Amino acid sequence: MIIYDNIHGYINLDPIASAIVDTPVFQRLRNIHQTGVLYLVFPTANHSRFEHSVGTYHLATQMIEKISKKQPELKITSEIIQLVGIAGLCHDLGHLLFSHLFDDYFLESLTNHNELKTLTKNVYHENRSITLINHMVDKYEVPLNKDQLKVIGDLINPKESEYGKWKPKYQVGRWIFQIISNPLNSIDVDKFDYLVRDTQAVGLKFGFNYSRIIEDAKVIENKICYSLQCSEDIYQMFFIRYRLHRQIYNHKAVKAIEILIIKLLIEIEKELNISQYILDPEKMMELVDSFIWHGHTNISIKKIIEEINQRKIPKLVYQDVSLHPCEFDEDKLKQSFDANTYHILRFKVGYVGGKSNPLNKITFYNLKNGKIISENKVRSFSLLITQKHQEYFLRVYCMNLSLLDKFNEYFEELSQSKNGSEENNED
């Protein structure tokens, strides 16, 4: 099978990958937006998990093929190349409606649910991906055996502790866990694809040279290393991640709609108990984006859908950004407003998940002699790179639009009081 992709061009899928794509389990990814509710604010962000998964397959295959040709001593077989590609293809198979929103906010809001407490292994999409792959293989007779499925599953949800249980013919090195979803330094083909795909979808005119990063990838001391010449491309990749999160994924209107979608999912949960769908692969497949929009008779559900469609969304009335967790006196706010009239949102935005310079976790090598470069030389490659790599946000949204003016007045007074206090401290 050959697929034309607007990012990578023509993509050749091997016979097993083609068999996977031609199943209802995989085709459902067409009905899950890659970026959740983003399309409701940025209309061109209409791409799906389907395209991203095929793109990740392409880049995963490309990376391990490049490493294999460059380093034949690693003894990477065509079967291993195939399994890495399939892991890339299926890494997001377990995503449900609105992608990360379902996991990170809706399921998190149900942590007190008695049965969910015992189902933590099923909650995250990586584990659901493995469940659906096994279901797909059994139901649609995809030609993958248990040993191959073990490798694919451990690559999707990296488990180096399971490496010793692989058949010896697959044990080419623990570096193999750093291709699809890299727990070591966050450089992986999943990120390559979604950063390029998402920036193009929303019309942002910047990018990074992921092809160069793949070309220079080399296994040294059981780690995938990169030439120092790639350091600026890699840093640009992390900067783009930061900018997308700051400017696009966490846009004030996007988060406002997410607040309503979470409310909507909680109301649907009361009616249909959809959190339990994750126990059954067939029921899981029903949870695509369109699931929430139609067929509801419940008045509360219909009201929220109407608010979203009529753009009666929560309004941002206050925001604070800091290099440290933001302080906010909610008790004081409660003296003026009922708790159900506002929503407080806290989140972090950074180059990676933590505070440190992402380059500090990457092993670079000298392109001329192939030897690892000391950390000091890496750190000094630019004096202009910031030492701060994470910001903390606090937002307050007005949930009752009839109170919008009162909220604005409250936070205007708060801002003036805060500024006056800071001026007095300076004196």
Language model region names:
Residues 262, 272-427:
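Terminal helices and disordered tails flanking the catalytic cores of nucleotide-processing hydrolases
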Residues 1-86, 94-319:
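Sequence-structural signature of the catalytic-core scaffold of metal-dependent phosphohydrolases
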